[in-house]
Amino acid sequence: MLSRDSSQLTSFNNKDSHDIIEVSQTLNALISIIAKHDHDIARHAQAIADIKKCYNLQMLGILQI
């Protein structure tokens, strides 16, 4: 009886460990995607800031395009 309970517990623990690893890998993939998007957003924000700066300089007559 005890050995059967023990083997069931081991089976559950192995399944739980596998599930935890799978969830961890999924979360790591999501974090990687989010980090890439954050980087892309920062690049776009910088590009917008550069465009606004050029526009303002052009409006002031400092920059001729």
From Swiss-Prot:
Note the superkingdom of the native organism: Bacteria
Q: What is this protein called?
A: Uncharacterized protein RC0052
Q: Which organism is it from?
A: Rickettsia conorii (strain ATCC VR-613 / Malish 7)
